[in-house]
């Protein structure tokens, strides 16, 4: 009798399930239910350079997140879409820089607020930390077994001697190759959005490597629309002679209101709308090409 009591009071050496374990188990159950109901899975990860020059694209990602989700959900009800974000900077060269991750989720209503907290800032030299970005995509994102895609937006290339013309960190090349190979093994299709020429060489090299690893990689031209210049053919006031104007033909002028009249106050808003629309349409086209 005494031995039975000892057994009852003996400590349980099995570790209590952690919150992460419970969440993983629940995810497996939910995925099993979806499979039995014929629901297909599509995981879409945005990999976005979040250094100082990329504010317009972060804003577009925030403002179009729900529009993209609504369109895909209504057009393809047989799919369960999840969306995630990796916002990367350049801690390799600027030690105060950090990367920020929003894991895959189908709770799209929460995305605008989360993305709205991301600030375009940082960046040291011209190349950025593509290695860190893809490492997070491989290690910090909860990919499912369905269709997987990365949409990578950048206006600057990667560190590493094979990816940029001049760099202080040539050893990054081997690291980036390793991360790309891991993505290819996961069967992730990558779309590379070239925003500026500075990034072209890196995107081209990544595409070449990724295809050699058996992966699918498509390059998309996605330049930022240039702002209108205050040339006299557009804004010149009729009462001012060419000789008296303070600006040359194709020169921006701090005194343009005196020379050319005021800028259309709706112009900035129109440019934002144009970028949002192009971003939304390009993402939808890329996703639909995989369905």
Language-model-detected regions and their locations in the chain:
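Divalent cation-coordinating acidic motifs and surrounding scaffolds
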Residues: 2-8, 14-248, 258-260, 264, ...
């Amino acid at each position: 009798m005494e031995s039975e009591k000892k057994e009852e009071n003996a400590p349980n050496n099995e570790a209590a399930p952690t919150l992460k374990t419970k969440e993983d188990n629940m995810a497996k159950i939910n995925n099993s239910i979806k499979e039995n109901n014929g629901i297909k899975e599509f995981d879409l990860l945005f990999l976005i350079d979040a250094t100082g020059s990329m504010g317009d694209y972060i804003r577009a990602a925030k403002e179009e997140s729900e529009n993209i989700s609504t369109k895909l959900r209504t057009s393809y009800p047989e799919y369960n879409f999840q969306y995630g974000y990796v916002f990367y900077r350049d801690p390799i060269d600027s030690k105060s820089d950090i990367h920020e991750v929003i894991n895959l989720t189908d709770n799209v209503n929460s995305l605008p607020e989360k993305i709205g907290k991301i600030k375009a800032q940082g960046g040291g030299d011209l190349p950025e930390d593509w290695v860190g970005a893809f490492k997070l995509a491989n290690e910090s994102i909860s990919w499912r077994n369905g269709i997987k895609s990365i949409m990578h937006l950048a206006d600057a290339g990667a560190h590493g001697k094979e990816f940029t013309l001049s760099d202080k960190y040539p050893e990054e090349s081997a690291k980036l190759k390793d991360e790309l190979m891991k993505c290819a093994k996961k069967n992730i299709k990558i779309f590379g959005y070239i925003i500026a020429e500075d990034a072209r060489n890196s995107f081209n090299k990544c595409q070449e490597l990724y295809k050699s690893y058996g992966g699918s990689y498509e390059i998309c031209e996605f330049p930022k629309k240039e702002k209108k210049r205050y040339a006299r053919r557009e804004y010149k006031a009729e009462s001012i002679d060419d000789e008296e104007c303070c600006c040359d033909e194709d020169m921006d002028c701090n005194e343009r209101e005196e020379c050319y009249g005021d800028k259309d106050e709706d112009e900035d808003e129109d440019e934002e709308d144009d970028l949002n629309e192009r971003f939304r349409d390009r993402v939808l086209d890329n996703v639909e090409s995989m369905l």
